[in-house]
Amino acid sequence: MGQINIEVTHLNFSYEKQNPILQDISFTADGQASIGVVGANGAGKSTLLKLLVGLYFLDSGSIRIGDVPLQKETLAQIRKIAGYVFQDSESQLFMPNVYEDVAFAPQNYGLPEEEVAYRTKMALAAVHIGHLAKKPIHKLSGGEKKLAAIATILSMKPDIILMDEPSIALDPRNR
């Protein structure tokens, strides 16, 4: 993974214009750092992460990931740079089994099958769930679903990984 900075400048966001969720947020995140966002329930932490990967759009301000400004026109490019693991990992698992789910993203990139198989195998090994490759998604525990979601993002080889509640449902060995 490379060193890609995230730069947020005067970010403002609201679900309803009269009720702002995030106001005048500015920061630069160094590409080599591990950073946590801390705050009370409902403070906008998950919303901020979703804004960073283009799942929501700003009311005003700007976001840059590396040298790419986050805009509707650059979403595909941003999503190759930044991977996102949802708080509820089940939201991003939709294929019949773990292997197919992890392989889905690199297949979508149009990579050759050998590369897809390699990336999938390496991602499953990285989170210690290679033995679950053929297990149906609906039979996974909460922690196994989280690990499968992380493996899915790893298979894409993004420069940045954003994780919402990264250790939720994981046992101490996998945190």
Question: Residue spans of the language-model regions?
Answer:
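A short, flexible loop at the N-terminus of ABC-type nucleotide-binding domains that lies
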Residues: 1-8, 12-24, 72-74, 113
